[in-house]
Amino acid sequence: MGQILSNPIIDKEHHSGTDCLTAFGLCAMQGWRMSMEDAHIVEPNLLAESDEEHLAFYGIFDGHGGSSVAEFCGSKMISILKKQESFKSGMLEQCLIDTFLATDVELLKDEKLKDDHSGCTATVILVSQLKKLLICANSGDSRTVLSTGGNSKAMSFDHKPTLLSEKSRIVAADGFVEMDRVNGNLALSRAIGDFEFKSNTKLGPHEQVVTCVPDIICHNLNYDEDEFVILACDGIWDCLTSQECVDLVHYGISQGNMTLSDISSRIVDVCCSPTTEGSGIGCDNMSISIVALLKENESESQWFERMRSKNYNIQTSFVQRRKSIFDFHDFSDDDNEVFAITTKKLQDRLNRSKDNDDMEIDDLDTELGSSATPSKLSGEDRTGPIDLFSLEALLEAGIQIRQRPSSDSDGNTSYFHGASLSDMLASLSNAAAGETEPNDADDNDDNDGEENGKNENAKKGSKIEEIE
């Protein structure tokens, strides 16, 4: 399961936005893990407003062995996509394959990242207004699900080493599957990065032990039936089936007072383990994006009204689902206490009286492009030697991290990721306590990778296309 904290970091990134094609609400939380290794993209329109076409692009990237590759994907993938000739030619399916391959190539060109040992999953969607088309590209075990008529439809499938098609490629490339892991190490069979598993110079990118080449699934949009898309990392899918997640979104919509950001946040609450006991599910980083599919000239509020008018009979609630997932835990009869681990005030979570060592936590929803500031310690500013008790309090309670959207040289400001303040504090605390740096940062998908000397820019990829 990897190393975990004594208390989860519960401060959440919230992002939301809308235009004429889609609306979205995203929530990401570090949770029980020692660091945040997820990243994401939310871009309602890739093109200029004057263009005839309108393309929305969303993505979730779940890192393992570190956050570097996931962060690179989040900050660079849009600019990489726009440079592809297939994108300029309107070949949307091929451009996603080309983009994944080119991202691996660009990683190897980066002096700071070419020797990095991390990798990440990638599940992304393009929504085309002109073609009325939803396209999903997926590598790894993050997942994309479409809600259509209240039912879940898989827009991706998890790439696990035990799948016959994946195992055949692994073995043909002189790899092996042991304990359901690639070479006994990596728990997924496709990923961006992870160059240790892509070092066979005699094979193309699509033939390597681990490949970044995505599967492509296309869906012709019917706006009377197709409602929203969910993209999430395995921290969510380890706890919920696709249908259960769709049902929870519909349940949130039916409440009448929840935004998409609110619903995504509550789903994270549902999936965060109340304790580190049990099987380990609910102790991972969590990221989820809910993308509403808007009809022509439909506003987000009108979309909500249309969804509620469908009157689905949802036989679940956030509380019921949480209790079902963690049935080993003795929850309070008070439903307000069911989500205590992610909602309780700091002083309650630490079981301490209010004093100057407490830290006020808020959880504001920030729109795209808005600025935010870190939470501050209450009381007077502190100087002098490190107060280990205060550090432990910060680590156990979580730290509110706020950032402006990052911007790269291409002007892409759609990518956000958590700051590393918690990592710094953990390092300071361990150093002061005489502890050594953890030597095993493994994830459910952890592995180390090495630079691959060559990565051919092949155009091959699996494709599953629905014929409607």
Curated annotation (Swiss-Prot):
- Family classification: Belongs to the PP2C family.
Which InterPro entries does this one have? PP2C, PP2C_BS, PPM-type-like_dom_sf, PPM-type_phosphatase-like_dom
Locate the PPM-type phosphatase domain: which residues?
Answer: 23-293
What this protein is reported to do is described as: Dephosphorylating regulator for many key proteins. Dephosphorylates the cell cycle master regulator CDC28/cyclin-dependent kinase 1; its activity appears redundant with phosphatase PTC2. Dephosphorylates HOG1 at 'Thr-171', to attenuate activation of the stress-activated p38MAPK cascade; its activity appears redundant with phosphatase PTC2.
The UniProt record gives the binding positions of Mn(2+) 2 as D62, D234, D284
The UniProt disruption phenotype note reads: Leads to slightly impaired activation of genotoxin-induced targeted autophagy (GTA); simultaneous disruption of PTC2 exacerbates the effect and also impairs macroautophagy and the cytoplasm-to-vacuole autophagy pathway. Double knockout with PTC2 also leads to decreased dephosphorylation of ATG13 following induction of autophagy and reduces the association between ATG13 and ATG17. Double knockout with PTC2 leads to elevated activation of HOG1 during osmostress.
The answer to keyword Phosphoprotein applying to this record is yes
* Record Pfam families: PP2C (PF00481)
Question: Could you name the domain of life of the organism this protein comes from?
Answer: Eukaryota
Q: Which organism is it from?
A: Saccharomyces cerevisiae (strain ATCC 204508 / S288c)
**Classification via PANTHER family:** AT28366P-RELATED (PTHR13832:SF565), PROTEIN PHOSPHATASE 2C (PTHR13832)
Q: What is this protein called?
A: Protein phosphatase 2C homolog 3
Renumbered to this chain, region (Disordered) spans: 354-383, 427-468
In alphabetical order, the GO MF annotations are: metal ion binding; protein serine/threonine phosphatase activity
**Basic and acidic residues bias (residue ranges):** 451-468
Its GO CC terms are: cytoplasm; nucleus
Q: Name one GO biological process term.
A: positive regulation of autophagy
Oligomeric and partner information = Interacts with the ATG17-ATG29-ATG31 and ATG1-ATG13 supercomplex; to regulate induction of autophagy.
